[in-house]
Design a protein with these regions (language model features):
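A bilobed periplasmic-binding-protein/Venus flytrap-type ligand-binding module shared by bacterial periplasmic
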Residues: 102-113, 215-229
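Beta->alpha turn/N-cap motifs
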Residues: 56-58, 68-82, 99, 173-174, ...
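A conserved helix-loop-strand patch within extracytoplasmic ligand-binding domains
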Residues: 95-145, 243
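Ligand-binding clefts/hinges and TM-proximal coupling segments of bilobed small-molecule sensing domains
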Residues: 129-144, 148-154, 234-272
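Ligand-binding "clamshell"
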Residues: 83-95, 108-110, 181-183, 188, ...
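Short helix-initiation/N-cap motifs at beta->coil->alpha
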Residues: 52-63, 150-179
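Short, polar/charged alpha-helical segment
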Residues: 29-51
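Short, well-ordered beta-strand elements
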Residues: 20-29, 48-54, 121-122
Length: 272
């Protein structure tokens, strides 16, 4: 009898230990929705209880992971993560790429690039990494020329050799870029903020050609990169059922898909 009770107690302890509270941080945008619909159900089957934590400023989710207040965050690309690690002395690492909406050039006043007049005002994200992305979109449109040999992830307006369209480039907080559409002719808006504001990627006058360093990631503390919860998150994103769910939802059309997605009826024209 004693052995049975001891065995039952050990089973209860093992069951309790297999379940865990998992705190995941997000900024405004589509990543929480994709996680809740496609990742959380897989994790819950493994015994996890998911707690969603929302942040409003870019450094906050990383600070929370560094301090152990949350386990992981999903909101940033690796270039931003590395810059944060350096400036804030964090030690966070990416564990898996996630489907990511690209930055785009939007306007409430014009329906095509051809309609945009000389001297138009363009708002761009003020942080250096995303300023560079915005300037590359303007260059791809043929509106500005970037000096040769410039660091491609640290461009600024000073690195333009020509601005034949005489654009007025105005830096703004990235999260406020969608609201700047009320005052500016155009706005370069990061995909997550565009989606959070209710814009569709198909509304953009031009989308960036998103390369892998700008595809967003799940980030954790380096000491947790091999932890079971981190491995389970990676497995959930790489699971075929997540890919099927993502590619079957028209809301996510136009996203840059991670390289581990296998070719099917792709949801992203930007997939390599």
């Amino acid at each position: 009898m004693t052995h049975r009770l001891l065995g039952a107690a050990l089973l209860l302890i093992a069951t309790a230990a297999s379940a865990a509270d998992l705190k995941v941080g997000f900024m405004p945008g589509p990543y929480r929705d994709a996680f809740a619909k496609g990742i959380a159900p897989q994790l819950e089957k493994k015994g996890y209880t998911i707690q969603y934590v929302e942040f409003s400023q870019g450094v906050q989710p990383n600070d929370a992971v560094e301090r152990g207040q949350i386990d992981a965050n999903i909101f940033q690309h690796t270039i931003y993560l590395e810059a944060n690690n350096k400036s804030q002395k964090f030690d966070l690492v990416p564990i898996v790429h996630v489907p990511t909406p690209p930055m785009g050039l939007y306007s409430k006043r014009y329906k095509s690039l051809a309609d945009v007049p000389e001297g138009a005002t363009v708002t761009v994200p003020q942080d250096p990494v995303n300023t560079a992305r915005a300037l590359r979109i303007l260059a791809a449109a043929g509106w500005v020329t970037i000096k040769p040999g410039v660091d491609p992830v640290a461009l600024s307006e000073r690195d333009l050799s020509a601005n034949p369209k005489k654009l007025k480039i105005i830096p703004v907080d990235a999260a406020q870029a969608p609201r700047s559409l009320d005052d500016a002719d155009l706005a370069a808006i990061q995909g997550n903020f565009a989606v959070a504001y209710g814009l569709r990627l198909t509304e953009a006058l031009k989308l960036e050609d998103m390369t892998l360093p700008y595809v967003n990631v799940v980030a954790v503390k380096r000491s947790n990169k091999d932890a079971k919860f981190a491995q389970d998150i990676v497995a959930a994103y790489r699971a075929p059922e997540f890919q099927r769910l993502f590619e079957s939802n028209a809301v996510w059309k136009g996203y840059r898909l991670p390289d581990y997605f296998t070719p099917t009826t792709t949801a992203s024209s930007g997939k390599p």
